[in-house]
Amino acid sequence: MVNNHESTVATRMIIESIKKTGTKLEPIILPATTPQTIGEGIDQLNMNGVAWTYPLDEHQDGLDLKTGLRLTHYKTENHSNRVACMISHMRCWQKSIELNQTIVVLEHDALFTDTLCPEDLTSEWKGGIIGLNDPRGATRRSQEFHRKVSSYVGLQPVPSVDDWDVPQGLAGNSAYMISPKAAKKLLNKVKAIGMWPNDALMCKQLFPWLEVVYPYYTTIQKGLKSTTTQ
């Protein structure tokens, strides 16, 4: 997903890493949704009338009655950037449905470190979403996440690294495989509970079948600015 010059350069690095590792993917570059194109993205997804329901500041933090989860706002200078990021991911999910194919979603900061052959993973997976990314430096409590995941080789459930009512999912959402069936479940959940940051929505409490894999296939490129905290 690309939305500026820095993202374009980073995307070239992703493509180069795909070639270097011999990863079996055919890249499709999807222009990212921006604050200026949020309305267009919502129209494409038929999500008109679906509100953002995740806390925007500390005054809204607390228990979400629909899900029973304890939600904490993300520090974001421009909330529209966070919404745009979510819509970009939702458009990727819709693309999986339209193609009727399992796809790999890559944010602009992803980088392959090992050869990925998707069929090697999909023959064993249970649910339809697999996190591919090294958690270290990419998620909350990343060392604990890594310690638990690296103790077992292969596909495994998302580890618990926090209290049971705190959303816990993939190690950041910069790289994950998703099936059309899972994509439909995610979009249906958005319609049911409203829009959340994609990494909060994709949590083990709402989708117990989420999986991660070790050894990892991707890491994040260093030094890139976040498009969601600005």
Regions found by a protein language model. Give the residues of each.
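An acidic/histidine-cluster motif and surrounding catalytic segment
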Residues: M1-L106, A110-Q230
